[in-house]
């Protein structure tokens, strides 16, 4: 596998970009997660960042990438509606792993948004998508631009939902390389990694949550539910950050 030219790939249509990365992805599938991170740091351009929602299994990718690339900027898009347990978990992991945390928020406060638009998350798919654009997508786009990012690491896994089932290790999204080192990990591998390194699940894991986002669009898991049904009232799985 050789170094890749981001500018040249960005000039290609999306389908051609996917085909151009196919051979590299075939090789990356054979590497372990640490090998994928090391390859990306050697062959993809900086600046590098890692995004995290500090969700149920967030400690895995935060520990894994930060061990190989200490002080890598960690981007959190804070909606202002996270669980209190999430904010405390962020503080705990930032201190424990010595994270270089970069917090980005919407340009409008949560209260101002409610005054202008009402409770967008109660306004069906269209309202949820607008909410996500304001609170997740725009802040992330701003972070990528301000930090001059060319390579973005994230902790998505195929097992998490149908929308992630066919994601490759390496893609181009929002004009930058996107690397998913643990894309093929299952829940057992996640558990083993946490145990091996003395790391914890999000505190709400013990209360029956499989996925954690905002307080108003996250539900506890109940028998018969798919994991993706615990978010956004089952209307959609993605918050917008990992789409497009």
Swiss-Prot record:
InterPro entries with a match to the protein in the record: PAPS/APS_Rdtase (IPR004511), PAPS_reduct_dom (IPR002500), PAPS_reductase_CysH (IPR011800), Rossmann-like_a/b/a_fold (IPR014729)
Family recorded in the similarity comment: Belongs to the PAPS reductase family. CysH subfamily.
Protein name: Phosphoadenosine 5'-phosphosulfate reductase
Organismal lineage: Bacteria, Pseudomonadati, Pseudomonadota, Gammaproteobacteria, Enterobacterales
A Pfam family: PAPS_reduct
SUPFAM superfamilies given in the database record: Adenine nucleotide alpha hydrolases-like
Group of enzyme by EC: oxidoreductase
Primary localization: cytoplasm
